[in-house]
C-alpha cells in the first residue's frame, strides 16, 4: 500500500480506538449517574450512622463522585466557566464556615452534610455528565418520578404512610414527628381525614414539589411525544394527592411557561418580558401593601390562614436574621418562635429565610446565585449545535429553577429536594458548556476546511 494511505489508515484506527474507549467511559459514567439518581430517592429510613454522621447511600455516592468531578476538572480538558461553577463551592465553604462560627465543631458536622450534598451534587452533574447524555438522564429521571408517584399513591390507598411503615418494619427506624402526627391525625399528614401522599420523600409538600418539577421537565422536553404528556399527567396526579397548594401552583406556573414557550417560537426576548412582569408585580406589592408576604401568597392562591402563617414566620424569622445577618444562628440554633402566638412550632416554611437564619444572608444569597447562575450564559435552546430535545431540556431546567426560586419564599426544601436542586443546576450548566464547546469545535472544523 501507498505510505500515505497506510499513515491515514493507522490514524483512523487510532482515532477509532480512542472513540470506543471514550464511549465506554461515558456509558459507565452515565450508568453511575443513573444509580445515583435512584439512590437519591431512597427513603430516610435506609440511612445509617458512621460515627456521629448520619449518612445515606446518596450522600456517600455524592461525596465520592464530587472527588471524581474535581479530579476531572483539574485535568487538561476544555472547560467553559459558568458563574455557578464558582458560586457552588463558595456556597459550600460559606455554609461550613458560618456554622463553625456559630456552633463550633457540632455546627460544622451538620453544615458539612448540607454543603457536601449541595456542592457535591452540583459538581457531580456539572462535570461528570457526558456531553450527549443529558436528555437520556432526563428521560430516566422522569421514569423514576413516575415510579415514585406510584409508590406514594400507596399511602392514601392503604390509609397509612406505606413507605415509612414498610421501612420501619425492616430497619426499625422510627421518626417521632411522624408518629405524633399519625396519632393525632395532624394536618401535616392528613387533609379532610385523608392521608397525604408522600412516598419516600420527607414530607408531602416535598413530594408534590418533585412531581411539579419532573412534570415540567417531561412536558417541555418531550412535548412532541406521548411519553412527555403521560409523565406530566401522572405528575399532576401526584401533586393532587399530596394535597399541597404550593406544589400545585408550581405545576401551573410550569405549565403556563411551557405553553408560553410553545406559543412564542420567534420571540427571543420572551423570558426578559416574563422577568420584567414578575419584577413589576413584586415591586408594586412591596410598595403599596402593608403585608407584602401575605399579599403575594394570597395572589398565588394559597389560603388566607396559610398566608398569615407565613407572614408570621417571616416577621419573627426576619428579626432573627437581622440580629445575626452575617453568620446566622446555625442550622439548629434556638429562636424565639413563641413570641408570635400564630406560630405552632419552630419549623421555618421558607427555604430562603431558613438558609439566612442558618448561614446568614450571604449563605442564602450564595445558594440563590448558584442555581440562578447556572442559567447565566442565557438562552441556549436555539443553538444549532444542540439537538431539539437538548434545547428544550435547557428551557425546562430554567423553568424548574424559576419555580424553585419562587416556592423558596413559602416552602422549605431539605433532604432529597436539596440534592435535586443542585442536580438541576448542574445539568443546566453542563448543557450550556456543551453548546459552547460544540460551537467552538464547529468553528475549528470550518477553519480547517
Report the location of each language-model feature.
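Alpha-helical transmembrane segments of multi-pass inner-membrane proteins
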Residues: 138-162, 169-243, 248-261
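Loop-to-helix entry and N-terminal half of a specific, functionally important transmembrane alpha helix
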Residues: 32-40, 276, 377-410
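Long extracytoplasmic/lumenal interhelical loops at the membrane interface
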Residues: 48, 292-362, 378-385
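Interfacial loop-to-transmembrane-helix boundary motif in multi-pass membrane proteins
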Residues: 28-33, 83-91, 124-173
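N-terminal hydrophobic segments of proteins, predominantly signal-anchor/transmembrane helices
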Residues: 28-48, 59-123, 401-405, 449
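Transmembrane alpha-helices of multi-pass inner-membrane enzymes
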Residues: 64-68, 395-449
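A membrane-periplasm/extracellular boundary helix in multi-pass inner-membrane enzymes
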Residues: 150-161, 259-301, 318-323
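A juxtamembrane structural motif centered on a specific transmembrane helix
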Residues: 1-29, 72-74, 388-389, 422-449
